[in-house]
Amino acid sequence: MSSEEALARLAAEEQQLQFTLFNPDTAWQLGCALRQEAGRRGLHVTIDIQFAGQTLFHCAMPGTSPDNAEWIRRKRNVVLRFQRSSYAMGMRLTLRNTTLEAFYGLDPADYASQGGSFPLRIVNCGCVGAISVSGAPQLDDHLLVSEVIARFLGINQ
């Protein structure tokens, strides 16, 4: 699969993985599912779900540090600004041989295009938040989030 095909697949994934309803109970259930799956995969991650500027779920698993929460903040900023997954944005920038700082003038202290933050989309509403993890390699972070969301929504990928 070419990089362009991979980007198209990521865009389709982002459009497919949308919620019809999202509230604090949904965030709790999804966050717990992410934590359980991270444990099953042997990953030590911090998990964060933010909706409309409010943190609805946050969990730092054993083996993580405050740096993971900082990575989440920076990756989440990318999702909220571009309404794309941080992994897709990183891949797009790599294809263009540029960075968030060079292309958009964004401070790397506040924005990170490494994988692990995914748009929280509600059908007919758009991006209303972000579901983020940090602690594993960026592809593993991305796959943890996207695969758990898909399972949570009953969507086969």
UniProtKB/Swiss-Prot annotation:
It comes from the Bacteria. It comes from Edwardsiella ictaluri (strain 93-146). This is UPF0303 protein NT01EI_1570. Belongs to the UPF0303 family. Pfam families: HbpS-like.
